Amino acid sequence: MKGERTVLDVNNFDRMRIGLASPTMIREWSHGEVRKPETINYRTLKPEREGLFCEKIFGPTRDWECHCGKYKRVRYKGIVCDRCGVEVTRSKVRRERMGHIELAAPVSHIWYFKGIPSRMGLLLDMSPRSLEKVLYFVSYIVTDAGDTSLMKKQLLTETEYREYRDKYGSRFKASMGAEAIKMLLEEMDLDKLNDELRVELKEVSGQRKIRAIRRLEVVEAFKESGNRPEWMIMDVVPVIPPELRPMVQLDGGRFATSDLNDLYRRVINRNNRLKRLLDLGAPDIIVRNEKRMLQEAVDALIDNGRRGRPVTGPGNRPLKSLSDMLKGKQGRFRQNLLGKRVDYSGRSVIVVGPNLRLHQCGLPKEMALELFKPFVMKKLVKEGHAHNIKSAKRMVERVRSEVWDVLEEVITEHPVLLNRAPTLHRLGIQAFEPVLVEGRALQIHPLVCTAYNADFDGDQMAVHVPLSAEAQAEARLLMLSAHNILNPKDGRPVASPTQDMVLGSYYLTMERPGALGEGKIFKNRDEAVLAYDTKQANLQAMIKVRQPNGELLETTIGRLIFNSVIPPEVGYINEVAGKKALNNIVAKCYRLGGYKATAQLLDGIKSLGFKYSTRAGMTVGLADITVPEEKRQILADADGMVNKTEQQFRRGLITDEERYEKVIDIWTKATDTVTKALMHSLDKFNPVYMMATSGARGNIQQLRQLAGMRGLMADPSGRTIELPIKANFREGLTVLEYFISSHGARKGLADTALRTADSGYLTRRLVDVSQDVIVRDEDCGTTQGIMVDDVKDGPEVIEKLEERLVGRFLLEDLKHPETGEILATADNEITEEQAHDIAEVYDKVTIRSVLTCKTRYGVCRKCYGRNLATGHHVEMGEAVGIIAAQSIGEPGTQLTMRTFHTGGVAGDDITQGLPRVEELFEARKPKGQAIISENDGVVAIREVKGRREVDVISDTEERMTYTIPYGSRLKVREGHRIEAGDELTEGSINPHDMLKVKGIRGVQVYLLGEVQRVYRLQGVDINDKHIEVMVRQMLRKVKVEEAGDTTLLPGGLIDVFDFEEENTKVIAAGGEPAVARPVLLGITKASLATDSFLSAASFQETTRVLTEAAIKGKVDPLLGLKENVIIGKLIPAGTGMSRYRNVKVINLDEEQVENLDSVNP
């Protein structure tokens, strides 16, 4: 019997290899052969000997106890019982000990025979169909032709085989089943085959060349990995440990068992039957049938349903095979390795906690007691309330009064993590200091709701307790809500006042002409506030106040009160504070005063906002919604214009299409005029108007529908209906109007449901493609950069140059073109002020970018620039790839939810949104593709046989002709001068064409601009660098065109860096370098083409990825985050980087810590 195995220490290895298992290897892993299909004895409920749960093979079911009961207790550790043969050890070895089944006939492994492409078929140069005929005993295959006229590997039917037998006797050999294939595979000389294929490659072309390349790939894989081809045929089947395919007793004496046990049972039964038949010397046809059934049983065990009908259990449910255990959302990878359930956690409904400070959360008492139970028990013993842990536990369970005092002490300074699903970005998990509260609901600070996207209509949140000192330190320094004030996607504050707080601040800072006390002068702030408290002056009255520096300041009393919470470095805010203004105040405060001052400011605004929105006593009544008097006249005018247009159409002056467009235009203008009239007629202190203009709730569109007119609507197909809804909600809709409205509303809801799922899937793909992008280098020393200017959509500027420069590094120092003074240096990050100065004098600037970074795995600090979540230069080890993916994916869900609130009013509905982003990132051929010019030159347009053709004539008189498909609209005119890559027709450009014409830089700039366009049109700001990270990952690979003297295969995809390395070696040796062209991969393809097979397998197409990796004997270097999470190592980012591994964290006593608050993280 083998000795105790040492458990693998996760942190002790830095790469992981996968390969094919040889029969000897499988026997080495095994602790014994499983010979019987029995599982457990139904009377004694003990495992049957030599069965699938045998204790002799897999270890004892109870700790330190053998099967027959002769040896019990730990003192017999390691003894093998002489009666039952069971080793006395822990029962958990049943999770790791494997068994095996010796097969009476070899069978093929379905992954290698049936996968696409069939690896077995490629090696033997047979089609999968003929391979199937041989393996499943339909045809014979000639394994040795001897001196006959037969060919090796020729297929023969039963009758043909008999004829040849009669004709040639035993001069040739032919057989069927996996044995025949095994013989052929054993005979293979890979080196010889490799040379033959390389010669063939040079001679053939077309389909045959592609096939040769494919075969060569497989041959090389086997040659380099040390795997043998015959290992694809199995003589031995491994049996996984019984704890991984458990059998549990249900109440009522029945048993529930894993499907794998059924599948193993079928294999064992058929194998035993086959052995018996062979011993009896049964006729060939019976043996053959049994062998085929054994082959099918093993297929079902490995991958049920891959070939033929799946084996089903009760109720016609297909059984879950080994492959199914790994695949999909419920498979081993995604369910258990990438997402685990943890203890020390709880969940509850959330309610608002308006009195909390930004870094606090309210934790219900009973929940806190349960979460911190071990800490409380330890403290009770330490303080002498209990003698031992057991009595302390009893005290906690009985909830004695002293327990609460101890709990109070335990939770001070011990942060907890709060998480709300769905966690769309890193702000979905933040740390807070718990405050004990009565009741059973978690209390949440109102300002972190935006980050969590939480509201209080019944949302729930989960609480987790960081246990170790390290975890607590990270929670406090990195995850505390007061440190997460900025949004990583654009660097704007995410914790900024909303709703009531905005309304309160807006009301407080408004001015009311002619209010009580207007024009009074006060000697200082307190006197002014006193006048308000004693009702001598109104809150919104314009007054003058003497400043400490002696100046007279004209302001309102409300603004004086408001400024009492604004830190002095921000200055005096003497304007109406709506949502935008508040946002800017917070951003400025963070820039000038850091997160500490900002947290205080936010809490101050929160208190004031709530207080004064209550004081304001905002209500909404019917009288507040006043319909403007001009409305009737505006509608009458519009009706008149529509009638005129109809007349023109009837006379045949305009087409139906023109008429439709004109009518739509008339009504759109009418709606706008009504809206303007409405805004004009509303009182500035009208509660509805205040709510909309302050940005607290609602918008002008919704106001228009309440008091103006609803306007034009879309029908279910998205076409605008030319009959507008003239009424508003105040007046009420007619039946027809109501019916028209229902289309839009329904479409909004359906869209939301569908697109939320799409957005989630997009985020998942983005994370997967970029998860190994980490800041690994200080400076990569690149000499290339990208040229940036304003991003435009037609004439409109979507993103200004200034915004694109902030927080980046210049490629080289930049001087003022006239004065020659240095505007910014290449060694320092560009500040907001510098960016402003540069944009004043330059239209285009070259900056360092992730796109041109030369760091091999990841990016360097200089090319990345500022970390937007902190506002400082990015740290080493920051997982910028994940942040980028979250920053693009999280607003994706917002793109999806936008259509909902406007009730489907035409013109606001977007089809551009998410599908377009997906199309770009997947590098798909776009719908409505534009034709682009492949060369620079002048345009000439002509008609040929009723079709338009565009010629582009270059300066060297070269003429390129493009045929314009029917129905496309031209974008160029006769005589226009255009550049390569310019569009000739309207539509979206195919990025692959762009890559051919304009090269890598061109396609990078195009993708960046297009993605930005979609998001900006939705009003979502995302920083360029996040999109750059994705685009870089899409262009990581090159396709080898000619191999030269390298070992690369033509047509193979290879990483740019590997390609350059290979070429450098060959050139140094005086050989011919390989030639490759860049390829653009969609994010799904790029994720699957990653070096890490663990990451790819856990993403999609698990079996295909593992099949390929096993044949190649791939080594996973464990550089990304995902692979490390899967095997349970610390991730190589942040504090998990190797350079921080040996940092020790200790808990100090209170006295030793003087003042930690003054230390900036």
From Swiss-Prot:
Region (Disordered): 305-325
Enzyme class: transferase
GO terms classed as biological process: DNA-templated transcription
Reactions that this protein is recorded to catalyse: RNA(n) + a ribonucleoside 5'-triphosphate = RNA(n+1) + diphosphate
Cofactor(s) needed: Mg(2+); Zn(2+)
Cofactor comment: Binds 1 Mg(2+) ion per subunit. Binds 2 Zn(2+) ions per subunit.
Keywords: DNA-directed RNA polymerase, Magnesium, Metal-binding, Nucleotidyltransferase, Transcription, Transferase, Zinc
InterPro entries according to UniProt: DNA-dir_RpoC_beta_prime (IPR045867), DNA-dir_RpoC_beta_prime_bact (IPR012754), RNA_pol_asu (IPR000722), RNA_pol_N (IPR006592), RNA_pol_Rpb1_1 (IPR007080), RNA_pol_Rpb1_3 (IPR007066), RNA_pol_Rpb1_3_sf (IPR042102), RNA_pol_Rpb1_4 (IPR007083)
Sequence positions that bind Mg(2+): 455, 457, 459
Pfam families, A to Z: RNA_pol_Rpb1_1, RNA_pol_Rpb1_2, RNA_pol_Rpb1_3, RNA_pol_Rpb1_4, RNA_pol_Rpb1_5
GO CC term, one of those recorded: DNA-directed RNA polymerase complex
GO molecular function, one term: DNA binding
EC id: 2.7.7.6
Binding residue positions for Zn(2+) 1: 66, 68, 81, 84
Binding-site residues, Zn(2+) 2: 780, 853, 860, 863
Quaternary structure, from the entry: The RNAP catalytic core consists of 2 alpha, 1 beta, 1 beta' and 1 omega subunit. When a sigma factor is associated with the core the holoenzyme is formed, which can initiate transcription.
Family designation: Belongs to the RNA polymerase beta' chain family.
Function: DNA-dependent RNA polymerase catalyzes the transcription of DNA into RNA using the four ribonucleoside triphosphates as substrates.
NCBIfam families linked to this entry: PRK14906.1, rpoC_TIGR
Protein name per its UniProtKB record: DNA-directed RNA polymerase subunit beta'
Source species of the chain: Desulfitobacterium hafniense (strain Y51)
Name of the gene encoding the protein in the UniProt record: rpoC
